Regions:
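Helicase P-loop NTPase motor core
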Residues: 1-71, 96-98
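Structured loop/turn residues at secondary-structure junctions
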Residues: 23, 53, 77-78, 213, ...
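Short alpha-helix plus adjacent loop in nuclease-associated cores
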Residues: 75-97
Length: 341
C-alpha cells in the first residue's frame, strides 16, 4: 500500500489580495479598474473571471462594465438588463422620462390584470393624441406635468390606479430612488402574481433600488443602463464569435471545473457569502465554505477577493458590515489586505 502525497508543480507567485471597499459601487469600480490594468499587462479578457455566490451580486458591476465598454458574458443567470422584471420597472421610469414612449406604455399596461391589447391600444392612442398635446412642455414645469396626468376618469379602475401612482411621482424634484421606491410598491403585487420565483426576483429589484440611490436624474440612470426601449421579456444572450474577447461573469456553481489566469471573488461578506439562510444548519454552512474553496481555486495566477463594508439588506433589514467568516482572521502572510479609498 502506497501513501498518497498531494503537491503542486507551481512555485512562487503573488499572494491573494483581500480588498475592502466602502460601498457596493466602489467595489464595482475597483474591479473594473483592475480588469483594465491586468489587460494592459497582457492578460486577455478571456483569461479573467468575476465569480459570485448569487446571480444578483453582479448587477452593479454589470453597469460599470457597460460604462467602461468591457464586453462580458454571464453564466448562471441572466444579465441584469435582460430580466423581465427589471425591464418592467425600467419601463415605468422610461415613461416618467418620456411620456411618448409607446413601447414602454404597452409593456406596463399589459401587466395590469384585465387589460388586453385592445384596451392598451385605446389608452396609448389617447395618450398620444390628447395628453401629449396638453403637455407639450412636459419637462419644463410642474404645471405641465399636472396637465399630462389630469382627467383620466374614463379609464378602467385598474388603469386609473396606474395613473394615480405615476402622477404622484411625476414631479421633476422627486429623486430616481424615491420614484423607484413607489414604483416597486405598486409593482410588487404584479410580481407575486406573475412569477412563482417572485422572492428571488424581489432580491433583484432590491438591488436595483440600491443602484438608483446614487443617481440624481432618471436620464443618467437610463443612459448608464444603455437600454433600448424594451419590447421583449427576455433577450437572448448572443454567443461570442471565435474572434470575440470577453470577460466571464459567473456564479460559483457554474464555474466548477474551470480556471482563469485572474479571478475576482466579489461580495465576500457575511450575509452575502455565506448567505444569511446558510446559518440555519451546519450542513448548509459547510456547503458555503466548500463554494468559497471552489471560487478561490479557480485562479491560476491572480486571486482578488473583495467585499463592501456597508450595505443594506432589504430582505432582513440588516446592515451588512462584516467580512466573510471564511476569510476573516487569515494572516497577512497568506492574504494581502487592501483598502479602497
Amino acid at each position: 500500500m502506497y501513501t498518497k502525497e498531494l503537491f503542486t508543480k507551481k512555485s512562487g507567485g503573488t499572494l491573494p489580495q483581500l480588498v475592502s471597499a466602502q460601498t457596493e459601487n466602489q467595489q464595482s469600480r475597483y474591479v473594473v479598474q483592475k480588469i483594465l490594468e491586468y489587460r494592459e499587462m497582457g492578460v486577455p479578457l478571456e483569461e479573467m473571471a468575476v465569480l459570485f455566490r448569487s446571480s444578483f451580486h453582479s448587477f452593479d458591476l454589470e453597469i460599470e462594465l457597460t460604462k467602461a465598454n468591457i464586453p462580458f458574458l454571464k453564466f448562471g443567470g441572466f444579465k441584469f438588463i435582460e430580466t423581465a422584471h427589471v425591464k418592467d420597472v425600467i419601463a415605468y421610469l422610461r415613461i416618467l422620462e418620456n411620456p411618448r414612449d409607446v413601447i414602454s406604455w404597452n409593456r406596463i399596461l399589459l401587466l395590469i390584470d384585465g387589460v388586453g391589447p385592445r384596451t392598451a391600444e385605446k389608452v396609448v392612442d389617447d395618450i398620444l393624441k390628447r395628453r401629449v398635446g396638453l403637455a407639450k412642455e412636459f419637462k419644463e414645469a410642474v404645471t405641465a406635468t399636472t396637465k399630462f396626468w389630469m382627467d383620466y376618469g374614463n379609464y378602467p379602475d385598474n388603469v386609473c390606479k396606474l395613473f394615480n401612482m405615476l402622477k404622484d411621482i411625476a414631479a421633476p424634484n422627486i429623486s430616481p430612488a424615491e420614484k423607484t421606491f413607489h414604483i416597486l410598491q405598486y409593482y410588487e403585487p404584479i410580481l407575486r402574481a406573475r412569477y412563482e420565483d417572485h422572492l428571488k426576483r424581489k432580491k433583484d429589484l432590491d438591488t436595483f433600488q440600491n443602484i438608483t440611490e446614487r443617481y440624481k436624474a432618471i436620464d443618467e440612470l437610463l443612459t448608464d443602463l444603455a437600454l433600448e426601449p424594451p419590447n421583449e421579456s427576455i433577450v437572448d444572450i448572443e454567443s461570442p464569435g471565435p474572434e470575440t474577447e470577453y470577460l466571464t461573469l459567473s456564479t460559483i456553481h457554474s464555474a466548477k471545473g474551470l480556471e482563469w489566469n485572474t479571478v475576482f471573488v466579489i461580495y465576500a461578506l457575511e450575509g452575502r457569502f455565506p448567505t444569511l439562510r446558510s446559518a440555519a444548519t451546519d450542513e448548509e454552512m459547510e456547503e458555503e465554505r466548500r463554494l468559497m474553496y471552489v471560487a478561490c481555486t479557480r485562479a491560476k495566477e491572480h486571486l482578488i477577493i473583495t467585499y463592501p463594508m456597508n450595505i443594506y439588506d432589504h430582505e432582513s433589514g440588516l446592515i451588512l458590515t462584516k467580512p466573510s467568516r471564511f476569510i476573516e482572521g487569515i494572516g497577512e502572510n497568506l492574504l494581502e489586505p487592501w483598502v479602497v479609498e
